[in-house]
Amino acid sequence: MQKLSLVWIITLSVSVITGDGLSILSCNKTDEVPTVTQCFKSCSDTILGEQVKVSILSQEDPTSIVVGRCIWRIMKQSFTETWTFSRLISAKEITWEPATTQECNGAFHNLCKNKAGCVSEDLEIEPEFSWARTEIREVKHLSIETLTMSAYLHQGAGKVLIDGVAVPISKKTHNNGDFTYVWDDVPISEVCPWKHPISHLSCYKDKEDLDDIYCPSQGISLVNYTKVDTSCPEQIYTDVGGLVFKLGKVDFNDWYPYVIESSDVAVKETISSINMALKMRESVHCHQDCLEIRRRVTYVDGFYYDPLPPAKCRLIGNCSVDSGSVTCNNGTLVWATCGGRRVWIDLKSGRDVKNAVCEKGGRSRISKNQFEGVLNEFHLNNSKFGNILRANEIHSVILKDNEVMDFARVVKSASERSGNFSEGTLINVRQLFRPMINFLRGIEHEIKVVAFSVLALIVGYIIIRIRTVTVAKAKSLESIAMI
């Protein structure tokens, strides 16, 4: 009986560690890279603080609302044709500007017709060359995509969750500094949209800042989370990553198995021994990770630090795909749902992409089997994470086996084109010397420079020789005249 109890304890511990959905990192550039000593210190401070249960809530939306997300995409590129007829093209320079509510509303209603799954086509710059001249071309177009968001009722008023912020539906617009969101007012169901937890985590409050919560087994940190006022019977919270959860008292432990109480002293001692062994194992793994802090992603004090390039990251868990998900750029990007909000996931880096750019024709639909293959590639590409992302097992893809995702509708949006020209000499000799120009254009630029330089030296030498001979003849004639 004692053996059965012990086996059940260990099995439960392992099953709780693997969570639902894919986990990714959301990162910002930083110069703040912890030292190995600071990392070692965090290993001993991991489990200090009050224990608390975090229940991750599923997005069972009785009411969903179609939201348009807009931003101006500005692309600049220079095209140079040298005096040797070589053509040089610079790298694309892409910047972003916020769109106004009026601009976004126009695209939302006129182009996307208030429907989900709409995305604007990215415009490209058409090359244009002039001899001995550099031309700078710029294309600016309004990028819009529509997605569904969670809507809920609170005190008789509808709210929509956008990037972890509860916005009144009656406002019909929101700007987070980068993107502009617009939507139409819709009637809201009175049913609580968050009733059934996806999973329960055993977590710890920070010993110094009780408002920060860390979940070691999942590698999740809940920092600067806020209350969401809803009609739900229990208090709901959301963090900056859009994760929706509730807090409660711990009735289990998913990191160290304190799940069975027994009057048998031997069983209690065995459980205590297992706990100590697991603590030692976690400590050893933590210290080993610290030694690799300059070479791979490392978890320190609630954040992940990626050394190449230096970035400070937060873990976003419970990402999954559904019938609204698509892939982009040959499967490199996946349009997924993370904590109730839509994000682009870069499967090569394991991070979210705030301003993703799909190549022309690069957006495609995907089946469940295809996505599982993409997911396997994700795990292979992100082996550098080591053991820190232990919640990246996907247990259920919402698609059925033979179901295919709807292909996103591509629309053309408002655009502006302009051309600015640098100083140069413009000589239209193309039509006259077209065959010779085409021949020269096929030669490497460096070879042409050398050839033209040698030719210039030869011509210069000939001119000097002619001048020398001319001067000598003139002097000879002067001498004859004097005689």
Swiss-Prot record:
Its Gene Ontology cellular component terms are: membrane; viral envelope; virion membrane
Which key words are in the record?
Answer: Glycoprotein, Host-virus interaction, Membrane, Signal, Transmembrane, Transmembrane helix, Viral attachment to host cell, Viral envelope protein, Virion, Virus entry into host cell
Q: Where are the transmembrane segments?
A: 443-463
Subunit structure, interactors included: Homotrimer. Interacts with matrix protein.
Q: What is this protein identified as? A: Glycoprotein
Localization terms from the record? Virion membrane
Residue ranges in the Intravirion topological domain are 464-483
Q: Which ranges sit in the Virion surface compartment?
A: 22-442
UniProt membrane topology term = Single-pass type I membrane protein
The post-translation modification note in this UniProt entry reads: Glycosylatedby host. Glycosylation is crucial for glycoprotein export at the cell surface.
Q: Which domain of life is it from?
A: Viruses
